[in-house]
Amino acid sequence: MFQDRSPRANTALRRALAAEGGRFAKEARDALGLSGEPALHPDLRVDPAARLDASSDEPLSEDDAEALNDFRDRVLDAYGAELSWLASLPTVVETERFLFVHGGLPHEDLASLSGTNAFALMKNDRFIDQRLHFSRWIVAGHWPVSLYRPEIPCAAPYIAASQRIIGIDGGCGVKLDGQLNALILPDASEDRFEFRMADALPERTALDRQEGSRDSVSIRWGDHYADILRREDGCAYVRHVSTGRTLWIPESFIFRDGSPAQIEDATDYALPVEPGDRVRLVASTPRGAVVKKNGVTGWYYGRLQ
């Protein structure tokens, strides 16, 4: 998933996907020199007349098109073998009790999905929120699991037991507190799961006890608009547009000013912490630190070492 953090990043992504309207087709695969199914690679050989999207009047300049085509050629020269290998992989991995897919599945009848556009299985937004139920466990990524949690931000795997779906996307690369999740199946014949997680955040030791807060809000991508009420000591006091909740956030979490502003995932949740707990530091401010403990992100107002 791509998080729209800046106009430059968003424009670059749209331009990269401009050809063929962002569709993944056989012509796109052939243009990249790849073989095999599924056709999962966009054609980056762009036409200067291509539009950024259906609602935009901004055309690609000749310089932009030339730069993108040069980038495409360099990527293919450097990683052609890797891209061919990726294109040869199955879209769905099937076992007796599990189905593994990047985005999601409409149902378990894989035979009936033969010949469909694999992109729909790769980009399946809000898969768990679709309230589908399966007999086998579906393990999916793509949609960061913190987006399923409206009160407390947590990047640990999300197990929707009644639906038999496990979301494992920890937001690595698109969330400031993102992490890489590894799901472990100790016994594939049992409904028993473990996981390990890793991130690149610095580790600190908490020195003071802190009780967890009981009422909190988690501002997430897609619902990330806030009015900035004031700024103070590297923080901003904001009002979340959709809920009306007010909270302090690190000022650096504002990635686009405006009325309203757009902010990174944020929360007013205070983590329960004991002295000696190891936490991961997301952001430090004079008001406190945003840290992560066991995959859960929140504020810590004690001392860190």
Residue positions per predicted region:
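Acidic, His/Gly-enriched loop-helix segments that form or flank divalent-metal centers
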Residues: 36, 62-166, 172-176, 193-199, ...
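Short acidic-glycine loop/turn motifs at beta-strand connectors
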Residues: 95-97, 161, 184-189, 242
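Active-site neighborhood of divalent metal-dependent phosphoester bond hydrolases
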Residues: 1-91
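C-terminal functional module detector
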Residues: 178, 185-222
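SH3/SH3-like (including bacterial SH3b) beta-barrel domains
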Residues: 209-221, 257-285
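SH3/SH3-like beta-barrel superfamily modules
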Residues: 221-250, 274-305
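Short, basic/aromatic beta-hairpin or loop at an interaction surface
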Residues: 196-207, 243-260
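A structural signal for short hydrophobic beta-strand segments in well-ordered beta-sheet cores
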Residues: 92-93, 183, 228
